[in-house]
UniProtKB/Swiss-Prot annotation:
SUPFAM superfamilies: Formate/glycerate dehydrogenase catalytic domain-like, NAD(P)-binding Rossmann-fold domains. InterPro entries: D-isomer_2-hydroxyacid_DH, D-isomer_2_OHA_DH_cat_dom, D-isomer_DH_CS, D-isomer_DH_NAD-bd, Erythronate-4-P_DHase, Erythronate-4-P_DHase_dimer, NAD(P)-bd_dom_sf, PdxB_dimer_sf. Its main location: cytoplasm. It comes from Vibrio atlanticus (strain LGP32) (Vibrio splendidus (strain Mel32)). GO terms for biological process: pyridoxine biosynthetic process. Belongs to the D-isomer specific 2-hydroxyacid dehydrogenase family. PdxB subfamily. Keywords: Cytoplasm, NAD, Oxidoreductase, Pyridoxine biosynthesis. Its EC number is 1.1.1.290. The active site is at R209, E238, H255 (proton donor). This is Erythronate-4-phosphate dehydrogenase. GO terms for molecular function: 4-phosphoerythronate dehydrogenase activity; glyoxylate reductase (NADPH) activity; hydroxypyruvate reductase [NAD(P)H] activity; NAD binding; protein dimerization activity. Homodimer.
Length: 377
């Protein structure tokens, strides 16, 4: 049995080699010839699975993407060809949410505002958007939600019309898939008209899909230099980036918002377990068994936490400025976008750290943000 796997999928080689002959390759450069005689394909979002890619896939029966998003796979084609397809919904929701929160916290320091006095508008309320909303509300930050598809499906949460959310939010963070058809397409959802209507004191964060934001229109909006702030983890034509846009962004990174070690381990184990089920084997893998101990596994609070404490705690675990600096320093080198993704550091989630403290420390909200908490007597 031959299994072809994206080389940027941690733990995959060791796990899948238990099931067959494994080949690791760059997911972005896969060709039809690579899939000849391949039984199973394990990918991430950079691989577009379409008619061209699988035109020579004479034995392909299983495709798994170790990502929550599925818009890079032609699912109708999978059905037509009798190829079983699976994804890893929610695997990276924590990492993406913590990326967005890190950007908010650092900007709060730089621009001199309190995150607790801001309203955060979340566009797209699937796994990531819903998790981010839960975290923010858990620590007392006001949230507005927009997701017309969820609303149509009967989701009982309180949703806000898009125009109202754009007007009333101080921070706008995007967590939609990319769609070009249907009643609510997201391609260029944030277009020239939307951008020109945003206030100078608003912040836009895109850690979803690059084409959700019209990058040329965003560049023009930022060139007004009126204080409007944007953070991009994704680009419209990645891995190509607009070098005129980069210096205008507060923070920018090469599509790594969801690249936390826990998220990648979850994605790998989820599709490994799906493949085991597909094969009818009883083997299973668990992300928690694969993860190393965090560099700072425990911290003790000696008083009630405040916003300064929150800044320190979250930045100790993940500070978006680290990835921003690495990206800006290396992006001019050809191939650096994918190289940084491939060599990404072992970033951890808040849950890797156990916080202890007595009742006066008020640890419960921090648990809602994702930290492991252990009250002491």
């Amino acid at each position: 049995m031959k299994i072809l796997i994206d080389e940027n999928m941690p733990y995959a080689e060791a796990l899948f080699s238990q099931l067959g002959e494994v080949t690791m390759k760059s997911g972005r450069t896969l060709t039809a010839d690579d899939l000849v005689d391949v039984d199973a394909l394990m990918i991430r979002s950079v691989t577009k699975v379409n008619e061209s890619l699988i035109s020579k896939a004479n034995k392909l029966k299983f495709v798994g993407t170790a990502t929550a998003g599925m818009d890079h796979v032609d699912q109708e084609l999978m059905k037509e060809r009798g190829i079983f397809f699976t994804a890893a919904p929610g695997c990276n929701k924590v990492g993406v949410a913590e990326y967005a929160f890190s950007a908010m916290m650092v900007l709060a320091q730089q621009q001199g505002f309190s995150v607790f006095e801001k309203t955060v508008g979340i566009i797209g309320c699937g796994q990531v958007g819903s998790y981010l909303a839960k975290c923010l509300e858990g620590i007392g930050i006001k949230v507005l939600l927009n997701d017309p598809l969820k609303q149509q499906e009967g989701d009982t949460r309180e949703f806000t019309e898009l125009d109202t959310l754009l007007e009333q939010s101080d921070v706008i963070t995007l967590h939609t898939p990319i769609t070009k058809t249907g009643e609510f397409p997201t391609h260029h959802l944030i277009n020239e008209q939307v951008l020109n209507n945003l206030r100078a004191d608003q912040i836009l964060i895109n850690a979803a899909r690059g084409p959700v934001v019209d990058n040329q229109a965003l560049k023009a909006r930022l060139q007004k230099a009126d204080g409007f702030t944007a953070v991009l983890d994704v680009f419209e034509f990645e891995p190509e980036v607009d070098f005129e846009l980069l210096p205008l962004l507060a923070f920018t990174t090469p599509h790594v918002a969801g690249y936390g070690l826990e998220g990648k381990a979850r994605g790998t184990t989820m599709i490994f377990n799906s493949y085991c089920e597909f094969l009818g084997t009883e083997q299973r893998a668990y992300a928690s068994d694969l993860l190393p101990t965090a560099p700072v596994p425990k911290m003790k609070l000696d008083r009630a936490w405040d916003e300064a404490t929150l800044h320190n705690l979250t930045q100790l675990i993940y500070d978006v400025r680290k990835d921003d600096a690495l990206f800006r320093r290396n992006i001019s080198t050809p191939g650096s976008f994918d190289k940084m993704r491939k060599e990404y550091w072992d970033r951890r989630e808040y849950s890797a750290v156990e916080l202890t403290g007595d009742e006066s420390c008020n640890l419960t909200p921090l648990s809602k943000l994702g930290f492991m908490v252990k009250p002491t007597l």
